[in-house]
Amino acid sequence: MKSFKIALAQFSPHIGNIDSNAQRMVEQANEAKKQNADLIIFPELSVIGYPAEDLLLRPNLNKRMQKAFQQLKEVKDIVMVFGFVHQTEEGHRYNSAAVMKDGVVLGVYNKHNLPNYSVFDEKRYFSPGHQHLVFEYLGHKFGVLICEDIWSINTVKQLSKLNVETVLVLNASPYEVGKPQHRVQTLTELSKQLNVHLVYLNQVGGQDDLIFDGSSFIINHDGEVAFQAPSFKEELYYSEFDIEQKRYKKIDPAPALDTIAEIYQSLVMATRDYVQRSGFSGVILGLSGGIDSALTLAIAADAIGADKVQAVMMPYTYTSQISVEDATEQARRMGVTFGIAEIHPIVNSFMQTLYPFFGNAPADATEENLQARARGTLLMGLSNKFGNLVLSTGNKSELAVGYCTLYGDMVGGFAVLKDVYKTIVFELAKYRNTLSETPVIPERVITRPPSAELRPDQKDQDSLPAYDILDAILYAYIEEDQSQSDIIAKGFDKEVVEKVIRLVDRNEYKRRQGAIGPRISSRAFSRERRYPIVNGWRPDD
């Protein structure tokens, strides 16, 4: 025997659908066997999916897990390494990996290092393991680790001392910008340092606000990247180990994505998986003629198909003719269902009802917000009637400073751009236009000064700093946790910094009520950034 073949199942589990996941794993294992694979590896917790959250606490989980094992035992003549929930008679619950062949479990590994930071809270559910698992197959010595374990140098060193040749790493590692590259760079050095081959297999797919990019890879013991799977694609991949050369055969990697392309593909996949797995027949959104809704429309159409997307332009007195024209033209180019619904009657009715209560109070943002809420009411009405999911179109910059209207433009079940700064929105729109022969987003949408069009001649910069300045301050404050004085020391205007930070801090209540959206950064407005709504904390200077 000159070589053996490993199958890497870059798998997108349906969280909690244990029977379906197990059946699909059986199908993939059988397909791998047809391709003469000797071993197939699946992601972390692949039987139930990651993160299963409090589904892990359901009393009948163990029974369902045992049923899944019976399904998986049907597979013959190939070794399977897969993730599952291991519950002991003593009541301990582990994040585990099983090695199975011909229906026999050859070994079980319990994850040692349980992450409890950022989006992770595994200590809520699991106990840590302490033993290593090493198995020999086809004359080759394999070790098994699960996700966080590979980042613990002590855990990896302990395993390497057992003379393993290849470490199989099962992962459910969420995406953020730059993370696929970071994994490869860091683990390349580790493989050289410990003189072991690494097979890194990652989950793929969108799950609520998390994105799993896949981006699986194999690194030879000398640091050579032998295989690199595409990002954001569910597929079976194969790699051969040359026994004589003692290395995995080099396969040309998938073309690398630049940052903007990577972000765009991640948002498309996240939107597709959220809509489809939530059971919606399609989506609906307000198409204003502005860049945020234009980009959201493009992502939605790319994710689920233009025939399942409905866009509604809802003009009012302050809506420019340019906006109507651009929205109409984009809808035509993309082939989505499109309609125009005037909101004058709704807003006027609101005004007439409220005027007796307003008395002589001067007009202010209240009247502007009524326009946004009229639009939100229309979208939710259409959603209720036809069963389509409303997509919220706001971006991270606006959400950070509260430049949005509760129960207005914030309505919706999924906020596609929730973790995307406005400056990146522009880059994504330009990128999307390069993907088709005819640009789908009219050029004027990209080049016009942004405006909410809620009052005459309104521009976003009437209320906010220029977006390049705003986003730089926000990134320093949110992603980097820098203090007010540190940000000012970078050269930003003191009053501008104070205003931006004040807006961020006072709008936590709005963000809590917003729809979830895909996480692409290390500090999204979701699981990893949690501040009390009511608090007396003030900037340190």
UniProtKB/Swiss-Prot annotation:
Annotated catalysed reactions: deamido-NAD(+) + L-glutamine + ATP + H2O = L-glutamate + AMP + diphosphate + NAD(+) + H(+)
Active-site residues, Swiss-Prot/TrEMBL: E44 (proton acceptor), K111 (for glutaminase activity), C147 (nucleophile)
Enzyme class name: ligase
This protein's pathway: Cofactor biosynthesis; NAD(+) biosynthesis; NAD(+) from deamido-NAD(+) (L-Gln route): step 1/1
Single Gene Ontology MF annotation: glutaminase activity
Binding, ATP: G286, L287, S288, G289, G290, I291, D292, S293, T393
Domain CN hydrolase: 4-243
Protein family according to the UniProt entry: In the C-terminal section; belongs to the NAD synthetase family.
Full protein name: Glutamine-dependent NAD(+) synthetase
Species: Acinetobacter baylyi (strain ATCC 33305 / BD413 / ADP1)
Lineage: Bacteria, Pseudomonadati, Pseudomonadota, Gammaproteobacteria, Moraxellales
Gene name for this UniProt entry: nadE
